[in-house]
Each structure stands twice: as C-alpha cells, then as structure tokens.
Amino acid sequence: MQADFWQKRWERDQIGFHLAEVNPYLQQYWPALGLAAQSRVLVPLCGKSLDLIWLADQGFEVLGIELAEKAVEDFFREHQLQPQISQHGVFKVYAHGPIELWCGDFFALTAEDTADCTALYDRAAMIALPSPMRQRYAAHLNGLLPNGSKGLLITMDYAQEQLDGPPFAVLDDEVRQRLGGVWQLQVETERDILGESWKFLQGGVTRLVERVYRLSKQGAAR
C-alpha cells in the first residue's frame, strides 16, 4: 500500500472510515487514563477526526500526524478555524490553539519530535495498514513516546481472508506480539459489531469484533 492510495481516497472523498461523531470508546475510556491537564496526545494517521476537537476540549494538547493535506485543510475549514502554517523539518504544520496537525509521513517522525507527548490515541492507524506496514508502524511507534506514556488503541478482529482491508484485521495475538514488549496492555472492552457493519455483512464476514486496549508504556524488557 503506497502513500498515494490514501491521497486519492481523500481527493475522491472515499472516506467511509471517517466518523461523523466523537468515538464513544474515547469518551468512555479516556478519562480513566488519569492524564494530567494539558498532556500532549499523539494521534497517528488522524485524518479530520472529530476526536481531535474532543481531546482539545478536555484540556489536552493534540499532535496529529496525517499524510493527506486535504484532510488537514478540511479539518480546519469544517471547524471554521484559521491555522498558523509553518514548517518543522519535513512536516508542514497547521496549528490553532492546542491542536497541531503535522502533514507528512508518520515514519519521518522522530523521538525528539514526540518527546513532550505523554499520551497516544490510535483509532484508525494500525487498522489502516496491511500486515508488513503494521509491523513497521508498531516498531516505529514503540520508539517514539517516553516511558510512562498512556493511551488507547482500537482494533478490529475478523477473518482477513473473508474480506480485503482497509480496515484490516488486527488480532489480539498480533497486538501483543507487536506492542507487548514495550507497552502494558489491558483490554477494556471487546464487542461484536457485525450487525452494525453493512460493508462486512455484505462482504461475507461472519465475525467482527471491535477491541479497545488501554496502553501504558513500560519500556523494552531487558
């Protein structure tokens, strides 16, 4: 999967993955993380998610990373915000108040860039990537945030052979293999959502589970 895949999806407005409301799991489970006010939250592959506004409204600073510039521009236009635009290395930065959206490749992000982030929110990043890229994504993510960081990860679990992604199937075993050496993982909830997902029903999927993980970075085992 190449970068232009997502660029074209945004240009053609093929964004069925975009939610027209704040994610209910975020609202339910984020407060229990107990983060300090004004903690900086890393949101990979953020799109124009309404979750960004919700996080800012709760008193957090938001660092969203998004490849498609159209998504970033749409976010600020739809919320009638006038961003300040600057350059940070290879990233074009759009900033307004507590929200910064960095337009560019997530894999160009460095630990120095995220040194002041102490939280992570991944609703649509890991499940957006095919398996080889997920391995690379997880390895890169593991090296970004400082120890003690907390966050939420939301995945979808189904038989990948029944339907092509995205969103891709990310099974519990994979999450634990990719992240478990660095992050403490706790399943907050898992829910069968097949009945709510016409695309998957129509595609012949027989089981679809949405799973929410609570993350706490403990550092690599020695």
From Swiss-Prot:
It comes from the Bacteria. It catalyses: S-adenosyl-L-methionine + a thiopurine = S-adenosyl-L-homocysteine + a thiopurine S-methylether. Keywords: Cytoplasm, Methyltransferase, S-adenosyl-L-methionine, Transferase. It is an enzyme of class 2 (transferase). One of its GO terms (molecular function) is thiopurine S-methyltransferase activity. It holds the Pfam family TPMT. It is found in: Cytoplasm. Its main location: cytoplasm. PROSITE patterns: SAM_MT_TPMT (PS51585). S-adenosyl-L-methionine binds at residues 10, 45, 66, 123. InterPro entries: SAM-dependent_MTases_sf, Thiopur_S-MeTfrase_Se/Te_detox, Thiopurine_S-MeTrfase, TPMT. Belongs to the class I-like SAM-binding methyltransferase superfamily. TPMT family. This is Thiopurine S-methyltransferase. It comes from Pseudomonas fluorescens (strain ATCC BAA-477 / NRRL B-23932 / Pf-5). The lineage of its organism: Bacteria, Pseudomonadati, Pseudomonadota, Gammaproteobacteria, Pseudomonadales. The gene is tpm.
